From Swiss-Prot:
Main location: membrane
Membrane topology: Multi-pass membrane protein
Organism encoding this protein: Salmonella newport (strain SL254)
The name this protein goes by in its record: Ion-translocating oxidoreductase complex subunit D
Coiled coil location: none
Record GO biological process: electron transport chain; transmembrane transport
Keywords (A to Z) from UniProt: Cell inner membrane, Cell membrane, Electron transport, Flavoprotein, FMN, Membrane, Phosphoprotein, Translocase, Transmembrane, Transmembrane helix, Transport
Transmembrane segments: 20-40, 42-62, 69-91, 123-143, 215-235, 242-262, 267-287, 301-321, 322-342
Disulfide-linked positions: none
Quaternary structure annotation from Swiss-Prot or TrEMBL: The complex is composed of six subunits: RsxA, RsxB, RsxC, RsxD, RsxE and RsxG.
A GO-annotated cellular component: plasma membrane
Gene field: rsxD
Amino acid sequence: MVFRIASSPYTHNQRQTSRIMLLVVIAALPGIAAQTWFFGWGTLFQIVLAAITALVAEAIVLRLRKQSVASHLQDYSALLTGLLLAVSIPPLAPWWMVVLGTGFAIIIAKQLYGGLGQNPFNPAMIGYVVLLISFPVQMTSWLPPYEIAATTPDMLDTLRMIFTGHTASGGDMTLLRIGIDGISQATPLDTFKTSLRAGHSVEQIMQYPIYSGALAGVGWQWVNLAWLVGGVFLLWQKAIRWHIPVSFLLTLALCAALGWLFSPATLASPQLHLLSGATMLGAFFILTDPVTASTTNRGRLIFGALAGVLVWLIRSFGGYPDGVAFAVLLANITVPLIDYYTRPRVYGHRKG
């Protein structure tokens, strides 16, 4: 009998990084389709720009670091970073914004720390926050869903808007944001926060066209449900674990329910929190990043719950309408501490 001597690890996971990343990209297709349906071609163009920028930036840095370009690009991590950033920004944002944000995410937030597996913060959310802080007007200029939009740009006008800022007829973002009621539109969360500050009641706000006949805003609830479908696919394929999305969504729902129960005149309802903004995208595609999330099961539950609390606090009392990106980055900071106190006890040893 011949014995083969080998070093650890003695058990192997057949699912490579590239396969997991590819599964996440596939799972994102329903969300991308929904955003394209309700907000136009801009989402697809932003994804293409972000993907090209991510791959080029990654290749340049890898070449400078004298590492294999082909092998690293084939793990699809750069592609996924670009995709997540692209679907997070307004579809008609200027082309240079997605290029700048994606380049910052890849070069500064990922490669500067040593590349995949070394970055402490989610690169896509770093890129998003940099853009949001630097260009708040452009980053909050979402088009109204086609159902309540007075004007919807076609494919060519979308390209012109992204690269020139104007349509063929001379229209600009101000014109395209006008809804059927003749008023400039914003996202449901942004509308809710802005209207409350203006002294409007929740009952009045819910009569706005953006909420007409919808639980959490026209179009946005379907976009979130589409991302939920993709998230369920990831759970089914075991590409992610259930702990983070479940604890995040339950905690966000609990905080929203308690807040709405005690102050229904000033705080948003649970369904608005769960089915608007980037809730489902954050729960299944961003918070579950294996590099920047907690690595223990108890830690994942704590990590997700912490992010849920932070999202509710930022949305309810902060200066930004949607707090997913900030919540993710703040939760990333706590990961080493969470992992330290939730690491499993070594078999045969007592807790020290």
